[in-house]
């Protein structure tokens, strides 16, 4: 970035007066420390946008920024810890370069024209509202760390109605990551070699996994009709629940299991799908591995090279579980559809 000619912001000097404010089309730079007030709405900008380069440390004095192009340079930092919540508001782009960082409690993204591009480090407690059409991009080798401390039970540590494109590492220490993106052009994507670590992973909209998702629990939060495509590794250490939905899980060379131990896929202890007509498409050597599977009124389809459903304990079917296509089913003898009379099965093969 060329910072030549950028006006320096220093100390606690305020830039929010009618005769002394940040102007659209102009560039500013924070070389050392700055905690003065700025015009944090679009009032003086006439629809334009200003640019702020952060080379030192910026401690904002207001809890939002609007109509801004903010670039955190290598070694630069924005610290919003003094606010319970900080909003990157409409018509704003925040870019964090490699070696730059964003620190805060809760960071939210507004709905109109908001893009957060991370090539460095984000360390926050939560990101509770990444609004419709907003975009969070996490680059290869970039990291997002969300502690998730004291997030209310009805909230998620990270919740997006817009888009998350993760190509680096996204870790949530406590709570849940939920995506509820309903637009095929603005959705959840976990890229090749990318990793997501979260206690709970909630599938609420349109998403694709080409990397690795490590969770203790995967669910759809008993609602919505999501479409999720898993082309790589989707791990649920404790449970997988896909209830109250007619949604679809599509797998292409994908694995849905409890994790990997000594080079072997381990089984999810509990795999449950509510009696609501969900569909699983297993294509080209995909596999689901679980201990106890409860799958009433679920349709399993398989295409391409042979795919596998493997239960290490039992499979319970129900009116009417359907299996079709190039699919193997492995289950301990006598534990498939146990108790269902052979002359009146509640499944179709």
Give, region by region, the residue ranges found by the protein language model.
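Extracellular beta-strand-rich, repetitive "passenger/adhesive" scaffolds
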Residues: 1-349
């Amino acid at each position: 970035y060329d910072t030549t000619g950028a006006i320096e912001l220093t100390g606690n000097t305020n830039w929010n007066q009618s005769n002394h404010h940040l102007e659209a089309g102009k560039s500013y730079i924070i070389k050392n420390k700055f905690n003065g007030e700025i015009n944090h709405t679009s009032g003086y900008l006439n629809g334009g946008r200003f640019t702020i380069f952060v080379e030192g440390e910026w401690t904002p004095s207001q809890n939002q920024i609007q109509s801004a192009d903010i670039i955190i340079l290598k070694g630069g930092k924005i610290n919003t810890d003094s606010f319970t919540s900080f909003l990157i508001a409409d018509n704003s782009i925040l870019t964090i370069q490699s070696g730059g960082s964003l620190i805060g409690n809760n960071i939210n993204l507004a709905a109109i024209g908001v893009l957060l591009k991370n090539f460095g480090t984000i360390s926050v407690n939560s990101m509770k509202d990444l609004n419709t059409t907003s975009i969070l991009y996490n680059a290869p080798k970039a990291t997002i760390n969300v502690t998730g401390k004291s997030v209310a039970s009805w909230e998620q540590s990270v919740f997006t109605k817009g888009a998350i494109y993760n190509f680096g590492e996204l870790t949530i220490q406590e709570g849940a990551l939920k995506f509820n993106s309903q637009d095929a052009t603005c959705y959840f994507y976990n890229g090749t070699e990318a990793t997501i670590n979260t206690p709970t992973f909630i599938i609420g909209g349109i998403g694709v996994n080409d990397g690795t998702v490590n969770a203790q629990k995967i669910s759809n939060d008993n609602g919505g009709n999501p479409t999720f495509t898993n082309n790589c590794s989707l791990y649920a250490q404790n449970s997988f629940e896909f209830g109250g939905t007619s949604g679809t899980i599509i797998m292409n060379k994908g694995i849905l299991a409890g994790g990997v131990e000594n080079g072997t896929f381990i089984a999810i202890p509990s795999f449950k799908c509510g009696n609501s007509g969900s569909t699983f498409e297993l294509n080209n050597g995909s596999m689901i591995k679980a201990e106890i599977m409860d799958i009433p009124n679920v349709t399993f389809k398989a295409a391409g090279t042979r795919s596998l459903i493997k239960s290490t304990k039992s499979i319970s079917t129900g009116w009417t579980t359907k299996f079709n296509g190039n699919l193997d089913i492995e289950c301990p003898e006598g534990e498939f559809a146990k108790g269902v009379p052979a002359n009146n099965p509640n499944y179709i093969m």
